[in-house]
Amino acid sequence: MTFMLQIYCKNNNSTREFPEGSSLLDIYNGFNLTMPYGPVSAKVNNKVESLDFRVYYNKDIEFLDITSSSGMRTYVRSLFFILVKAVEELYPQGSISLEHPISKGYFCKLHIDRTIGLDDVQRIKQKMQEIIAADIPYTRTESHTEEVVRLFEKRGMMDKARLLDTYGQLYSYYYQLGDTVDCYYSSLVPSTGYIRLFDIVKYYDGLLLRIPSRENPTKLEEVVKQEKMLEVFQEYHRWNQILGISTVGDLNVACNHGHATDLINVSEALQEKKIAQIADEITHRNQDGKRVKLVLISGPSSSGKTTFSKRLSIQLMTNGLKPYPISLDDYFVNRNDTPLDENGKHDFESLYAVDLPFFEEQLTTLLNGEEVELPRYNFTTGKREMSGKKLRIDEHMILIIEGIHALNPALTPHIPNENKYKVYVSALTTILLDNHNYIPTTDNRLLRRIIRDYKYRNYSAEETIARWPSVRAGEEKWIFPYQENADAMFNSALLFELAVLKDYVEPVLRKVPNRCPEYSEAHRLLRFLNYFVSVQDKELPPTSLLREFLGGSSFQY
């Protein structure tokens, strides 16, 4: 006798019975759902699963397409596996690595014994199209971790072998696409035919894997030039290779062998060196007759802008300058005057949450050598107040203006460019899970923010995760379009960082109840953090950027 399950589908708000052991794809078809771009995965009791996942108990299910962030991650993983297979078939002695997101796509490196040409790109694209047309199934196999490690060692895939060997789990799984074996750490689509749209083009010394737009999946994302961002990523990838730490498996092995302190010291020293170089460049501009009066520091949420500005100020002081910090937060309009977003909620990420006329008035007065009384924003009352602090700048002073809109030309439209030095700060994660699995830079910042919000603002992880999509939307609209305007880019991510954040953020994430929608993201982050060996923060210096989020900083915030 077949046991029947009660399955609730969130997509159409209905419940139906299905036989025990039905796959998610069977359930999708049974509900007669029509998703214009097709399902690519599903949330089962708020946990993301592949469509071949079988159900043995009553469940709540929500099917996902590529208009969701989770669905797009599934699509990209599946697409990259196709690229891996294409390269394996075309270049048996070569390999491909997925380095990082850039220009609304993904930067990849083809490792062969010669410089790649346009004909190589065309061959790869054609082979990928053939693999998609063949509609080859992705198959998942679970086995003892020791056996999976040996499998990857035999194939020369030491990055995956090291990661799984240090993972600490009894069982691990791997995927196959025909004869091609690989490891991906979350859901894939059922078969290659699910991949409808992509492109691959030559991009500097590598390849750019282009993907559909989440807003309009019938079109590819437009390529956005990000030369400075690419340069920063590649510089740090070179540093990682010099240190011998390119993947999480490398990091885990180093930490297990007692080298965590060395990694902390070298990473912190590298950051301090970069900050000193930026301070020197500002000083040299002053000596060349280009009087820098403003240092504008921008970056997305939880990028470490505040600590960076304090450390830069110290370096400027060692060069004989007198920096004075000004936070754009103190120039917010009163909360009642804050613009509203499309959902009718206060849009604190909007440029117009800043009182632009008042800011420009005070800035002009200061630059004319006159005195102003600085404001202070009272976040409790939601009103701007005058602080009682008076400021007049002299020829040795530089204003350090920090805030998410600092690089927006509309903030300082009447200040000559030669009087401004612009810095973009972000946590650009350059370590990889393995050569085929990158770590999203947004994950790094989200983990920082969860810790900070819980520790200092009394927000739960559930609340921070719920707010994150609107924060990201604000970044896409107000911050990222201006990042290439920067005179300098500073990467605030530290090589060992995620291993240190792990012990702080895991207990907070575990408090998210599985009945709430945010559980899906909390569960994903917990699974991701499982791959890291923990590193204690006792060796972190008090001036570390991480101290802004963890506590124990010698700076006042």
Specify the residue positions occupied by each region the protein language model found.
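Hydrophobic anchor at the beta1->P-loop junction of P-loop NTPases
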Residues: 295-297
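Conserved lysine of the Walker
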Residues: 305
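Hydrophobic positions on the alpha1 helix immediately C-terminal to the Walker A/P-loop
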Residues: 308, 312
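Conserved nucleotide-sensing/catalytic segment adjacent to the nucleotide-binding pocket
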Residues: 324, 333, 337-380
